[in-house]
Amino acid sequence: MSRYRGPRLKIIRRLNTPLPGLTSSPIVNSTVNTKSQRKDKSEYRIRLEEKQKLRFHYGITERQLLRYVRLARRAKGSTGQVLLQLLEMRLDNIIFRLGMAPTIPAARQLVNHGHVLVNERVVDIPSFRCKPQENISIRDRARSRALVDKNLNNSQESKKLSPSRDFLSKVPTHLRINTKNYKASVNQVVNRNSIGVKVNELLVVEYYSRQA
């Protein structure tokens, strides 16, 4: 299944939850009673929707998500938490969490177009897995830094307008940024409380239990 490129508001309305990585637009309040709506759903449908939250928030394909689930199963620790850590430590997501891009698709473009350095080398692979002690910076080019300046300013405005992006009000503790010199660093692996989307990762693991 390919990466979703359709209307983003349609997705957050369907899932009835904000997905700040997908779009900076706030969710429109629904008149449907969420509790009664949940009762009408099958267990499979509930697991499917939790899986879709991850897929659309991080902007990855079904095949990519399944691969991450398989990696998480082979790692030590809780499969669900390891899965979230793998997704959060992607380079495109880290650029987003640093406020250098308004959404993960926008962060992916910055990476794809060669604006981002990791340990002083250009990395143009959005799925690149960042590790603790790695340094991230923006290329010393006028265009690269102008794009990031614009995004940093817009990010501040977006936080004021959209309550769903309150978690973006400050850089998470596993990251550090110096906006004056366009440099950041990864201090540690992200912890569960700093995950950028509200999701029940155990239901996602259950969804893939017969596939991974």
Swiss-Prot record:
Part of the 30S ribosomal subunit. Contacts protein S5. The interaction surface between S4 and S5 is involved in control of translational fidelity. This is Small ribosomal subunit protein uS4c. It comes from Staurastrum punctulatum (Green alga). SMART domains: Ribosomal_S4, S4. Residues 89-152 form the S4 RNA-binding domain. The lineage of its organism: Eukaryota, Viridiplantae, Streptophyta, Zygnematophyceae, Zygnematophycidae. One of its GO terms (cellular component) is chloroplast. GO terms for molecular function: rRNA binding; structural constituent of ribosome. The gene is rps4. Keywords: Chloroplast, Plastid, Ribonucleoprotein, Ribosomal protein, RNA-binding, rRNA-binding. One of the primary rRNA binding proteins, it binds directly to 16S rRNA where it nucleates assembly of the body of the 30S subunit. With S5 and S12 plays an important role in translational accuracy. It is found in: Plastid, Chloroplast.
